């Protein structure tokens, strides 16, 4: 989004807004779910967010925006490469012990680029490939969390565990 009016315009055309009580989650998910639906990507989600999320709204928005963008782009590529495939995104946020789990999973066309050290980078060309996932990794590490990325049988998963230091109640 280039301005707040772009985000507002997107939210204004959305069928149903997500209302968890966390503005970062609500804004990102409302926009991304609407976009995915309009582009033929099936979505399922479950949100059980804590009252005080252990990341600030900018960090949380960056993480959610990046992982959702990657999943949506994978769905769009899948439609182009094999129109018989049905792209999907499965997403959840939930507490587990003293952690907050953020998980996104999608099917994809099987094309991934990696770095020498085994990090998954991107399928994009040019200087900006892989920047989003690197940013996610930085933010998760800053929060003393764990980022796990897996790819198996054309299923791509990002699993993030963030310590819930306040062990606070759910919204």
Protein language model features and the residues they cover:
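Conserved short strand/loop->alpha-helix "switch" segment adjacent to the catalytic nucleotide/phosphoryl-transfer site
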Residues: 17, 43-64
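Conserved polar catalytic motif of the HATPase_c/GHKL fold
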Residues: 65-74
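Short beta-to-alpha transition helix within the HATPase_c
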Residues: 5, 9, 21-39
